[in-house]
Amino acid sequence: MPTAADIKNYTKPGVAPLYTYSAEIDTTPSATTPTWATICAGFDNIAEALNETVQQYFFLCGNGYPANYVTGIAPTITLSGRRIYGDTAQDYIFGKKYDLMGNRDTHFRMKRTDDAGTTETLISANVTLCNMTDISGATNDASACSVEVRFNGAPFQGDAWAS
């Protein structure tokens, strides 16, 4: 049974709902200075996958249990939601769906805003836009859309483009 002091001093653990996160995409990747468009309108789901390469070894001294080594990762951010025509970020992304090679390469950064209103850039990366779908769903619904933002090389923790 908790004491009165336990009740008075209770602190609820902090959580960060996904709406505290934001993402931006560079719509002029070949320019000297990025032109950032906020990825927001229409997207209602974001998921991170590290896509790890794990080497698993069962050494004699492990008594039948493995030793795991993460030897590589291919980070991907998947965004999905509803297609919004006229939105700068979505028009840029889905305007690339029939492009090949370097024409799908751009820059990406993800941020988070804390309870005090301070925004911090968590990661920034060179990316390739993959597996885009912007025509999908039932006839009475707004078209479902999705895109995979795949990192090229290691991401930078922070804002690589900060002045």
What are these model-predicted stretches?
Residues 2-84, 126-143:
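Solvent-exposed edge beta-strands and adjacent loop segments
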Residues 70, 99-105, 132, 150-153:
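Short, surface-exposed linear patches
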Residues 83-86, 154-156:
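Acidic glycine-/aspartate-rich tracts in secreted/extracellular proteins
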Residues 90-126:
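Short, acidic/charged, Gly/Pro-enriched secondary-structure junctions
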Residues 90-92, 157-163:
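Short, charged, solvent-exposed linker or helix-capping segments at domain edges/interfaces
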Residues 1-2, 163:
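Glycine- and charge-rich intrinsically disordered segments
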Residues 111-159:
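Short beta-strand and beta-hairpin "edge-sheet" elements
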Residues 7, 11, 81, 103, ...:
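Short, intrinsically disordered low-complexity segments
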